[in-house]
């Protein structure tokens, strides 16, 4: 069967997602004596950003502009000089409690230090998931007994095997704010001839790998991030964040889009736990670029994910905030990307600096421990380069610095402090790394990832190492 062209797959994707976007049933009239919630506010991203600065008492003029990654002639062009890349070389002490007690045992990590790190990320970086997030109810259409031509996630092309495609929608209870509907869109593709429950790789945004996963006998799940939360600041009074806030602007510690997308992945995993065709103990999470950031956040916060493929996540993902290279904290605190983060994160692009953050990316990676986590990038330079914006070296440094947490929990880290050249993989441990020569994609690393991940997804299921920290 011929491979599906990318344009055809995209059109099919749009058709499927549109078919899943039916509004939830209209809520009935409010009970006698209860006041209806106010209408959701309509704001531009700039207006919403300014409201957050007002709450933080930060003048807009005090927010530092981020570097320019496109124009080398710009006065604020990104730094690519390694001599200037580490103005704050000292990272937060990952294995030291707030009370200055060294963390020398797994028990102390699980009981004390890990919860401390989670609290820092909640309060200062990604924001808090509300305690009263509405319930999600999953609905499914009859399975599509199609072959590869009915595939999904077009970069995978023709999987070459018969498949079962399930189109699902997770309807979020909006009875408290009927003006906002959230319908989480998920497409699950399974090998039709599987002898029993199969592992599944869940991917944010359809980043590819479907063909390789299905060829291995695994399933592939496409999760639509924008069906959970829009990827812009103007959407913060809608989506799951807006629904929880009844259409009103965020408070400083409220969650941003990265945390909301990760929450949506957990709710999709809730569904997979009910599907008898899926081995829910062997579900991985993956994403590329901003969705690579989301995949790392999901992996860090949701211990039910068995393995992670973190693609080109850069600043806000696997890259050290304290590195002065490529994209910076100041890019994430500007009005174009602030919606990914908690409002409180804006402080670190204004009156505070990245060195004032109580945590850094090495600790986000450490929250994934002891589970296998593969960090993927394209090469910074040379033929087929991804470029320098994502700071490959800063992410490698973070992975190296996360290694002690993996070793503390009895697992192997990268095994070296020297970043290997492109197309040389570090895959001997539960922390893995590879750069390819194929640009801004995970595609050329998928085969290496699958061979590495099979060591974990093909073995006995392991119980989660800790209870899920976010509410249903």
State where each predicted segment sits.
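Short glycine-enriched nucleophile-adjacent loop
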Residues: 265, 292-303
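N-terminal cap/lid segment of alpha/beta-hydrolase-fold proteins
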Residues: 129-196
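Mobile cap/lid helix-loop segments that gate and shape the active-site cleft of serine hydrolases
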Residues: 307-364, 391-418
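Alpha/beta-hydrolase fold nucleophile elbow
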Residues: 278-289
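Cap/lid segment of the alpha/beta-hydrolase catalytic domain
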Residues: 195-280, 314-324
């Amino acid at each position: 069967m011929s491979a599906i062209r990318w344009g055809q797959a995209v059109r099919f994707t749009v058709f499927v997602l549109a078919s899943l976007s039916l509004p939830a049933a209209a809520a009935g009239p409010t009970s006698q004596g209860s006041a209806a919630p106010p209408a959701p506010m309509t704001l531009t991203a700039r207006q919403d950003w300014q409201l957050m600065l007002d709450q933080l008492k930060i003048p807009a003029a005090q927010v530092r502009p981020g570097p320019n990654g496109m124009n080398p002639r710009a006065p604020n062009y990104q730094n690519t000089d390694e001599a200037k890349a580490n103005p704050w070389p000292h990272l937060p002490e990952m294995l030291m409690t707030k009370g200055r007690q060294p963390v020398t045992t797994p028990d102390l990590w699980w009981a004390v230090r890990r919860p401390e790190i989670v609290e820092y990320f909640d309060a200062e970086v990604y924001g808090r998931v509300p305690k009263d997030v509405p319930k999600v109810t999953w609905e499914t259409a009859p399975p599509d007994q199609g072959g590869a031509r009915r595939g999904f996630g077009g970069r995978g092309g023709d999987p070459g095997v018969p498949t079962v495609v399930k189109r699902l929608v997770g309807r979020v209870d909006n009875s408290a704010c009927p003006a906002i509907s959230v319908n989480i869109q998920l497409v699950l593709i399974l090998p039709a001839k599987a002898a029993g429950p199969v592992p599944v790789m869940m991917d944010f945004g359809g980043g590819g790998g479907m063909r390789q996963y299905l060829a291995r006998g695994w399933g592939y799940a496409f999760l639509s991030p924008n069906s959970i939360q829009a990827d812009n600041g103007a959407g913060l009074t809608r989506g799951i964040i807006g629904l929880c806030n009844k259409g009103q602007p965020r408070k400083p510690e409220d969650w941003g889009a990265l945390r909301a997308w990760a929450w949506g992945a957990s709710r999709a995993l809730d569904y997979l736990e009910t599907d008898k065709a899926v081995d829910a103990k062997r579900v991985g999470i993956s994403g590329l670029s901003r969705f690579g950031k989301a995949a790392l956040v999901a992996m860090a916060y949701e211990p039910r994910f068995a393995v992670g493929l973190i693609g080109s996540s850069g600043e806000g993902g696997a890259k050290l905030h304290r590195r002065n290279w490529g994209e910076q904290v100041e890019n994430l605190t500007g009005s174009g990307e602030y919606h990914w983060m908690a409002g409180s994160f804006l402080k670190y692009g204004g009156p505070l600096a990245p060195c004032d953050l109580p945590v850094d990316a090495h600790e986000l990676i450490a929250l994934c421990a002891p589970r296998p986590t593969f960090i993927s990038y394209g090469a910074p330079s040379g033929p087929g380069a991804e470029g320098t914006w994502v700071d490959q070296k800063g992410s490698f440094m973070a992975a190296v610095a996360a290694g002690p947490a993996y070793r503390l929990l009895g697992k192997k880290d990268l095994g070296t402090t020297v970043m290997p050249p492109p197309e040389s993989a570090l895959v001997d441990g539960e922390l893995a790394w590879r750069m390819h020569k194929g640009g801004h994609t995970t595609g050329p690393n998928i085969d290496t990832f699958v061979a590495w991940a099979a060591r974990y997804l093909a073995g006995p299921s392991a119980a989660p190492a800790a209870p899920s920290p976010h509410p249903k």
